[in-house]
């Protein structure tokens, strides 16, 4: 399950790698903000087929987005949930443990990280 836009793009790339290297069936889902602190998952998860979930996002700053995503996922009978973050900024305000991190990058609160994932570029900018 990838958070809308970049998290979803990263999740699709991970799904391709998994499908190309392992003989397991995977499904891809997008999680996005519906209202403030309320998220939806599409397509909807099948409660009878929810076993192992990877929750993917591009940048972890405070942890607020991922905590609300986990809250939504826990509405289902999940057996195993792992988190994957491309860039961890180390400014957690919530007790979030990330299972897989691309890069730990200690930044100031005034600095901004922009992840660009499109057909021409796959870049991370710090400003």
Placement of each model-derived feature along the sequence:
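Short glycine-rich phosphate-binding loop at a beta-alpha junction
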Residues: 1-4
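Glycine-/small-residue-rich active-site loops that bind phosphorylated ligands and cofactors
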Residues: 6-7, 61
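Residue-level detector of flexible, active-site-proximal loop/helix-junction positions
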Residues: 7, 35, 88-90
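Internal catalytic or translocation cores that form aromatic/hydrophobic pockets or channels
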Residues: 52-74, 78-80
């Amino acid at each position: 399950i990838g958070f809308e836009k970049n998290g979803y793009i990263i999740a699709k790339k991970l799904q391709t790698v998994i499908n190309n290297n392992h003989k397991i069936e995977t499904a891809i889902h997008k999680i996005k903000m519906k209202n403030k602190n309320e998220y939806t998952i599409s397509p909807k998860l099948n409660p009878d087929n929810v076993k192992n979930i990877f929750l993917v996002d591009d940048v972890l700053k405070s942890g607020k987005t991922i905590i609300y995503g986990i809250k939504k996922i826990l509405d289902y009978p999940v057996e195993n949930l792992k988190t994957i973050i491309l860039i961890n900024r180390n400014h957690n305000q919530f007790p979030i443990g990330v299972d897989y991190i691309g890069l730990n990058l200690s930044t100031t609160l005034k600095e901004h990280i922009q992840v660009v994932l499109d057909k021409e570029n796959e870049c991370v900018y710090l400003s």
